[in-house]
Design a protein with these regions (language model features):
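RNase H-like, Mg2+-dependent phosphodiesterase core
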Residues: 1-145
Length: 145
């Protein structure tokens, strides 16, 4: 599940981040985005799309991800702001907030889905990314827990 990250690591990049969000489905509640960076080649076998994991497994992996990741950022946009700007803009805002919370500046960002408004770093949009990228899958777990 590191093939996409490997593409950038093999070009000499060290800090490849994955972003995913949770909370776009509920009628009420915040949208939460997470951004995760792993050390080159650092693989966690059990990581996969958070929707395919039990609550117990997500909680276990949450702790492992925080322990092993070089950086984890979380962005939250609350209901009042969602009502003000709409869910799509709120999702993009949460993504950008999560990047701003990282302790390490990414050199490239993998975003789950076909589009985003992330402009400060180079981006690859990965449809179904939480099944294809460990960094995105880890972000989906962090955002969901």
């Amino acid at each position: 599940m590191l093939e996409i990250e490997n593409k950038y690591w093999s070009k000499g990049l060290k800090y490849v981040a994955g972003i995913d969000e949770a909370g776009r489905g509920p009628l009420a509640g915040p949208v939460i985005a997470a951004c995760v960076i792993f050390k080159k080649g650092d693989r966690i076998e059990e990581i996969k799309d958070s929707k395919k994991l039990t609550d117990k497994k997500r909680n276990e992996l949450f702790k492992i991800i925080y322990k092993k990741a070089l950086g984890v950022g979380i962005g939250i946009v609350h209901e009042s702001k969602i009502d003000e700007i709409n869910i799509l803009k709120a999702t993009f805002l949460a993504m950008n907030k999560s990047i701003g919370q990282l302790s390490v500046n990414p050199e490239h960002i993998l975003v789950d889905g076909p589009y985003s408004n992330v402009k400060i770093y180079p981006v690859e949009h990965v449809v179904n990314g939480d099944n294809l990228s460990q960094s995105i899958a880890a972000a989906s777990i962090i955002a969901k827990v």
